[in-house]
Curated annotation (Swiss-Prot):
InterPro entries the record matches: QueA, QueA_dom1, QueA_dom2, QueA_sf
Protein source organism: Streptococcus pyogenes serotype M3 (strain ATCC BAA-595 / MGAS315)
Top EC class of this enzyme: transferase
Name of encoding gene: queA
NCBIfam families on file: PRK00147.1 (NF001140), queA (TIGR00113)
A GO BP entry: tRNA wobble guanine modification
Tagged with keyword Transferase: yes
Protein name, as recorded: S-adenosylmethionine:tRNA ribosyltransferase-isomerase
């Protein structure tokens, strides 16, 4: 298949720049790929799509304030680092600007020198491996000095950084939010649980590769980014019990899908506790092993995320749903509206 097979027209004014005042007041497009139906609804009605005995699976990763502004002590030149992933100890893979000035051995100071970074390796596309030195606890230092790394298509300043976190965000480590979860409120989750739906949490730390456009024409040549995931034994057991009792595994967002399908592929359809790195690329032709339904936001044209949704619901039907969403002025991307895919 070709990357252009997943293109669609998207007016720029439909790219949501700010979150709605109420998380669950966003619109929800409910699609059923077998019946080929589409229903316009609102997100707080997602509870009607869930049955007692189902499992709702959410990614509890927390976005780090991963954008750091500092300067080189020798030249006082300004430097921006974007933390991508913790490789080991105090070493991180980062995206550096301007990268050409940062050679191995270069140092960058942040916040009057409370945090220092030393370049220890050079990667392609402006990537660097840095080692941080600091006093105290790294995450606390980062909270005091770092900024929330909003996606490149959001140009408005975010008034409240917590609006780029889910209400259940817990495990620090992401460079971007698992945005399908931004619609849930604590109250809505309580109502869903009271209906008899099992709330299950996993972790996948979202990397910036999620925004990286597919740069090849042939999908088979695309090099998928790697992200760290983890599913506990308790969560795995709940999901096995749900499946055995005839309930559905309903994933919240593409990150939850990628975690569950990584594990399903690794264990021949069985759901086992597991952790590691995944670069799974789900595209049309993929056979789903764990996920029965899911919610997700509206994604970028030609992105791997549109391809994932198409793998589940069929490319033609998904693009038809996207055209409907454009016609009905749904809001797109991270702060936008959602779809529920049966």
């Amino acid at each position: 298949m070709n990357t252009n097979d997943f293109d669609f027209e998207l007016p720029e004014e439909l790219i949501a720049q700010t979150p709605l005042e109420k998380r669950d007041s966003s619109k929800l497009l409910i699609i059923d790929h077998r019946q080929k139906t589409m229903v316009d609804s609102h997100f707080d009605h997602i509870i009607d799509q869930l049955n007692p005995g189902d499992a709702l699976v959410m990614n509890n990763t927390r976005v780090l304030p991963a954008r750091l502004y500092g300067e080189k002590p020798d030249t006082h030149g300004h430097v921006e680092l974007l933390l991508l992933k913790n490789t080991q100890g105090d070493q991180w893979e980062v995206l550096a600007k301007p990268a050409k000035r940062l050679k191995v051995g270069s140092q960058v100071n942040f916040g009057d020198g409370h945090l220092k970074a030393t370049i220890i390796d050079e990667l392609e596309h402006g990537g660097r491996i840095v080692e941080f030195s600091y006093d105290g606890i790294f995450l606390e230092v980062l909270e005091s000095l770092g900024e929330m790394p909003l996606p490149p298509y959001i140009h408005e300043k975010l008034e409240d950084a917590e609006r780029y976190q889910t209400v259940y965000a817990k495990e620090n480590g992401s460079a971007a939010a698992p945005t399908a979860g931004l619609h849930f409120t604590t109250d809505l989750l309580k109502k869903i649980e009271a209906k008899g739906v099992h709330l299950v949490y996993l972790t996948l730390h979202v990397g910036l590769g999620t925004f990286r456009p597919v740069s090849v024409d042939n999908l088979d040549e695309h090099d998928m980014h790697s992200e760290f995931y983890s599913l506990s034994e308790e969560a795995a057991q709940t999901l096995r019990d749900v499946k055995q009792a005839g309930g559905r595994v309903v994933a919240v967002g593409t990150t939850s899908i990628r975690t569950l399908e990584t594990i399903g592929s690794k264990f021949q359809g069985d759901i086992q506790a597991d952790s590691g790195w995944t670069n799974i690329f789900i595209k049309p032709g993929y056979q789903f092993k764990v996920v029965d339904a899911f919610s997700t936001n509206f994604h970028l044209p030609k992105s791997t995320l549109v391809m994932l949704v198409s793998a589940f619901a069929g490319r033609d039907f998904v693009l038809e749903a996207y055209r409907h969403a454009v016609d009905e002025k749904y809001r797109f991307f991270s702060f936008g509206d959602a779809m529920f895919v049966n």
